[in-house]
Swiss-Prot record:
Protein family (similarity comment): Belongs to the radical SAM superfamily. Lipoyl synthase family.
Cofactor(s) recorded in Swiss-Prot or TrEMBL: [4Fe-4S] cluster
Cellular localization per UniProt: Mitochondrion
Superkingdom, taxonomy of origin: Eukaryota
Biological pathway: Protein modification; protein lipoylation via endogenous pathway; protein N(6)-(lipoyl)lysine from octanoyl-[acyl-carrier-protein]: step 2/2
Alphabetized Gene3D superfamilies for the sequence: Aldolase class I
Protein name, as recorded: Lipoyl synthase, mitochondrial
Organism of origin: Xenopus laevis (African clawed frog)
Keywords associated with the record: 4Fe-4S, Iron, Iron-sulfur, Metal-binding, Mitochondrion, S-adenosyl-L-methionine, Transferase
Major subcellular location class: mitochondrion
Domain annotation Radical SAM core: ranges: 122-341
Chain positions recorded as [4Fe-4S] cluster 1 binding sites: 106, 111, 117, 352
Gene name in the database record: lias
GO BP terms, alphabetized: lipoate biosynthetic process
Amino acid sequence: MRQCGLVRAAQLLRTCGLAEWHTPYRALSSLPDEKKELIKNGPDLQDFLSGELVDKSSWAAYKGDLKRQKGERLRLPPWVKTEIPMGKNYNKLKNTLRNLNLHTVCEEARCPNIGECWGGGEYGTATATIMLMGDTCTRGCRFCSVKTARNPPPLDPDEPYNTSKAIAEWGLDYVVLTSVDRDDISDGGAEHIAQTVSMLKERNKTILIECLTPDFRGNMKAVETVAKSGLDVYAHNVETVPALQRHVRDPRANFDQSLNVLKHAKNVRPDLVSKTSIMLGLGETDEQIYSTMKALREAGVDCLTLGQYMQPTKRHLKVEEYITPEKFKYWEKAGNELGFLYTASGPLVRSSYKAGEFFLKNLIEKRKTKAI
């Protein structure tokens, strides 16, 4: 569960010539033309690197090691260092969360973009990813800093109402709902998530809702419950390449199970936008990355994000390699060539980072066009 400025108009999907990859997969015809257009006009890599980054002129001159040697710990390269902007939006959002006893993956997973997403600039869009079902997970993935326990506290029955109330107070047009894994509950919390989505839609029929879900231990009925709840984007992260699944994720998770979750959500609701994320820098090879991207496209996944793995604490997996911005740009092009409708690839990209802005920009433009 690796979640992860002003909106700048930029087109992501453009003609990309990768000599070795000739045949792009066709974009899914099941998506309505309106949603395809919204995704097509999303931001590019620079939108995900916007904010107060250090001087980029130092990037090329950086001579530090990018691959970890045995017994060593890598130093942070300049392109993953960023100032954390705080402001009125940040403080307002944080206070609202505390007052309503809500949690965000932004805080629990120690996301490096929390200041930018929550701050949103004085005129930007504040984005937060609400983490449902408490702050304690039943799984222990080696990359994640969220608290774990075999038997977390029971679900808060008021959480769906409080969440919808908070979103109404913020006046957001797009919200991301994620959750901890709750293997201690028969349906993994699917009904709780679905109820939250339903209440949000009751308060605001036009709000766009993305759910970043658990794998529900392969319970496809639970997947179906969430998929049919009224959400707009169904997201579930495969996290890493198949070869590293056992090393990186909890033993109860695996690549095929995650892929089946994404497939089933689309089978149930072909009009849904499906989305997943991969962390880089865990020791994967280029061949493994490309093979994974290809498998995701063949499974019908619409959107893909790729970001740098960052070790949250010394107890977690060490970073094996820091991927350069140029290499992330390479994978963005690869994703476009494979036919993903939306590929976000950059060092600080997270699956939920500023998630709504590419939708919001286009919705605003569309409304202006209708008004003329």
